[in-house]
């Protein structure tokens, strides 16, 4: 196992215009302060205020959005990071681990990773993801890319259909089809930060949001040693070269994770579990008393000193005494949140320290709060009650189905841009209006300038005389559409769908 030295991981250099001659702790901290400014002031962070956490298109400002959720995750991440550093200081290990002059950057990377962790999520959350992937699967049929004979291939895109005698090109076609049918919020976050927003963050800061290490074009089983880390796609084919450079800069082996990402993940797990239940009470899906009974029933028999007793029962008893002259529900969630944090944060911090050799190497194949402990059971309890009583509620399910329909409908509306031939689409990009394509011209004008420029830049770097050019061009055209639609807020997507379907004046 390699020696633990965080000076080899907290890399403050950038992809472009990297600072030179940096020597002191203060100078390094200023670089990460610059990262904070770039992130907090980015439009992608602002758009989170109109993206779903659990309840789409919610008008009640007390119910969480992706932005308020991310701010809560940021605070919990800061708490865990400080707890880890405090414990390492008590053990006199800060200097041994190269952290004695990097405590500020350590905390800042964790905080900003938490704030950005949902930055790539599409409108309507997981149902938006599912809509994008289902729509592309119904046209690209990635499973047919393994088919024999090749005539069984149902792919509706000529450039990506498998052809006899073109094996090197067929392998690229397989990768592209698989990649486009595995849109994922975390992978889109990497694309957003590097390719679309060009935020030019430090290598360490980007490493903090690379939650999953599986390429989106991966086919087949993942290695058992990295099964958890490769649970979902973490980056796209379009960012393959950037991620290869990132791994080199952060000394990460293939499919390994950046150490501070485990802290961000734990902060997210702790935050959303309690928050989802609180939002459900705010939405009157159930009362606080009903929630307590749901939790009590799901946990089952327990001793007086059990974690359930110390966290949930304690919160319930204190809220009923109403000593602070506040509503029972306000008090219950205040105590539940405090009790949960006071138990889970120290536990997550100690798990990080206990498993630091594997975490530093990037190979710890678990989440910090997924084990056989009572702390893990408490999180599962919150999640299971939310799944059973919140996510399955008719109002929630109806909104999710509407969200799925909106995203599917928008993709269908913009489909003419994907139906154009390579030469016709190239002409449209160059002229921006082509008389014989009135619909396509108007759809193209609606696309964001940022996304169009990303497409143009990517295609301009391709050798136009290569046999691979039509494949890559179509790939980036699909990315253009995915970028545009996934970047919408819930409300904008809803309004745009209604306008283009002519269902309102």
From Swiss-Prot:
Residue stretches making up the HD domain: 66-273
UniProt cofactor(s): Mg(2+)
GO molecular function term, any single one: magnesium ion binding
Secretion signal, residue range per the UniProt entry: none
Family matches, as SUPFAM superfamilies: HD-domain/PDEase-like (SSF109604)
UniProt key word Hydrolase: yes
Any one Gene Ontology BP term: dGTP catabolic process
Key words of the record: Hydrolase, Magnesium
Pfam families noted in UniProt: HD
Entries under HAMAP family matching the protein: dGTPase_type1 (MF_00030)
Role of this protein: dGTPase preferentially hydrolyzes dGTP over the other canonical NTPs.
PANTHER family: DEOXYGUANOSINETRIPHOSPHATE TRIPHOSPHOHYDROLASE (PTHR11373:SF32), DEOXYNUCLEOSIDE TRIPHOSPHATE TRIPHOSPHOHYDROLASE (PTHR11373)
Subunit structure: Homotetramer.
Protein's name in the database: Deoxyguanosinetriphosphate triphosphohydrolase
The species this protein was found in: Escherichia coli O139:H28 (strain E24377A / ETEC)
């Amino acid at each position: 196992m390699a020696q633990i030295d965080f000076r080899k991981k907290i890399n403050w250099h950038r992809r472009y215009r990297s600072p030179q001659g940096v020597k002191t702790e203060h100078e390094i901290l200023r670089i990460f302060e610059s990262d904070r400014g770039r992130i907090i002031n980015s439009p992608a962070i602002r758009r989170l205020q109109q993206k779903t956490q659990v309840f789409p298109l919610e008008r009640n400002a007390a119910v969480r959005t992706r932005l308020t959720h991310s701010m809560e995750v940021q605070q919990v991440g800061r708490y865990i990071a400080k707890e880890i550093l405090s414990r390492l200081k008590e053990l006199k290990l800060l200097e041994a681990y190269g952290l004695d002059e990097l405590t500020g950057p350590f905390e800042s990377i964790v905080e900003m990773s938490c704030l950005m962790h949902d930055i790539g999520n599409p409108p309507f959350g997981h149902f938006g993801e599912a809509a994008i992937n289902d729509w592309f699967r119904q046209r690209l049929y990635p499973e047919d890319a393994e088919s024999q004979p090749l005539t069984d291939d149902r792919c509706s895109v000529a450039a990506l259909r498998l052809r006899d005698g073109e094996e090197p090109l067929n392998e690229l076609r397989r990768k592209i089809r698989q990649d486009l049918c595995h849109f994922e919020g975390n992978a889109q976050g990497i694309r957003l930060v590097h390719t679309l927003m060009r935020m030019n963050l430090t290598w360490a800061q980007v490493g903090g949001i690379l939650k999953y290490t599986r390429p989106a074009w991966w086919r087949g089983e993942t290695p058992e040693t990295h099964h958890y880390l490769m649970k979902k796609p973490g980056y796209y084919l379009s960012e393959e070269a950037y991620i290869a450079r990132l791994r080199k800069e952060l000394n990460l082996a293939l499919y390994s994770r950046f150490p501070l990402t485990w802290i961000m993940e734990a902060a997210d797990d702790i935050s959303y579990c309690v928050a989802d239940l609180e939002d459900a009470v705010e939405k009157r899906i159930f009362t606080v008393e009903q929630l307590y009974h749901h939790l009590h029933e799901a946990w089952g028999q327990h001793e007086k000193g059990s974690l359930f007793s110390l966290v949930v029962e304690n919160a319930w008893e204190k809220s009923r005494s109403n000593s602070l002259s506040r509503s029972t529900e306000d008090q219950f969630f205040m105590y539940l949140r405090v009790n949960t944090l006071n138990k889970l944060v120290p536990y997550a911090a100690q798990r990080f320290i206990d498993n630091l050799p594997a975490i530093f190497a990037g190979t710890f194949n678990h989440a910090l709060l997924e084990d056989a402990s009572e702390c893990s059971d408490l999180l599962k309890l919150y999640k299971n009650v939310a799944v059973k009583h919140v996510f399955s509620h008719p109002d929630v399910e109806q909104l999710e189905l509407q969200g799925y329909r909106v995203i599917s409908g928008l993709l269908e509306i913009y489909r003419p841009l994907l139906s154009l031939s390579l030469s016709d689409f190239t002409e449209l990009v160059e002229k921006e209006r082509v008389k014989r394509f009135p619909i396509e011209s108007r759809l193209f004008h609606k696309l964001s300038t940022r996304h169009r420029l990303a497409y143009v830049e990517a295609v301009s770097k391709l050798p136009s005389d290569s046999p691979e050019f039509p494949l890559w061009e179509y790939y980036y055209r699909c990315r253009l559409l995915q970028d545009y639609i996934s970047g919408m807020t819930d409300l904008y997507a809803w309004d745009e769908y209604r306008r283009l379907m002519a269902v309102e004046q």
